[in-house]
Amino acid sequence: MVVGRDGKPRCAWAGSGDGGLSRYHDEVWGKRTHDQSAMFEALTLGVFEVGLSWSIVFGKRDAFAKAFRGFDPTRIATMTARDVDRLVQDASIIRNRAKIQATVDNARAMIAASPSLGALARSYEITRKQAPRSLTELPTTTKQAEAFAKQLKAQGYRFVGPTSVYAFMQNVGVVNDHVRGCFRATN
């Protein structure tokens, strides 16, 4: 737990409240959303986080938003092999061809899928009786995330293992993993 200059206690990973990561913690992470672009952003950042650290991916968040058309799945689904080739050369993002192509494929899956990503997310909601005491109490995955990942893969999503799906669930508020004492925790 850290207390920022604004006096708000936050999860330690968010920092002191002075930068983008703290704003993300305060305004986005763990906040329930049904917005398709916000959900796709969370899914995409999770795809790029596989094998890397969150700080690396988060540091490129604005560049990803630009590269992936504001995280609008309908617009991303129209991207071509030429667009993928162009993004592989874009030094402002993580230039992993497989992850870039997975993002395009995931947009297509999201548009075609039934039930929708939002409906699936709601069906795997996790309710806690109390907030975790510390980050060490947080799981990296759950049975719900394993089942959710399996269903997403069946719908054609890629790079969606149980760990990245659990991170997605945290990000979009399907589970509230703000730690006890954080002003965003549900105690």
Residue ranges and their predicted role:
Residues M1-N187:
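HhH-family (HhH-GPD) DNA N-glycosylase catalytic core used in base-excision repair
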